């Protein structure tokens, strides 16, 4: 049982730098889910890095490495799509809108997008490909979110914030999980917890105990 956060601890924040279409981000989202479930008072910042712009593909060797380290397997629906160029622009726009305008729905939305992409094999490059997700979550994003040719203004601004944070932690690698407690910034090594996501709860609690004495 995790101890509830005190009023002082409620200032803790979790930053998740990711791409919805990145397989490493997909398996790391389960850690974010565990942390949010155990520490609902920690403010979540789900920052989409918009890494995939339609100019690259996912390598089969990379998928194999993710499967090995996370002890998971990707659906045939998804694996049948990996030779296609990957474009997460619309997902970046939608996730940024949700983070800014409907933050309580941001994590459920992220999970739904990743399920659609990695389990059902949907590329999510058109507005209609998001219809089921949006209807299920009862969201009302503006039309500008679904301009597939470029990132929205808000997504571009968020990218600048991501770049600034990456300079601080001295890495551009995604995914990245960062716990901010007052003026302390802790980079959580997500690779340690992919097989046992619940184990990250103890790691977060240790950091809270250390920095909030």
Language-model features, listed with the residues they occupy:
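Generic signal for short, ordered secondary-structure residues
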Residues: 11-14, 77, 92, 145
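Structural alpha/beta surface segment adjacent to cysteine/selenocysteine redox centers
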Residues: 26-121
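Short active-site neighborhood of thiol/selenol oxidoreductases, capturing the structured segment around
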Residues: 8-23, 28-32, 44-45
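C-terminal cap of thioredoxin/glutaredoxin-like
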Residues: 18-21, 28-36, 115-213
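A broad, low-specificity signal for short, low-complexity segments enriched in glycine/proline
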Residues: 5-9, 55-58, 134-141
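A short beta-strand-turn-helix
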Residues: 1-12, 159
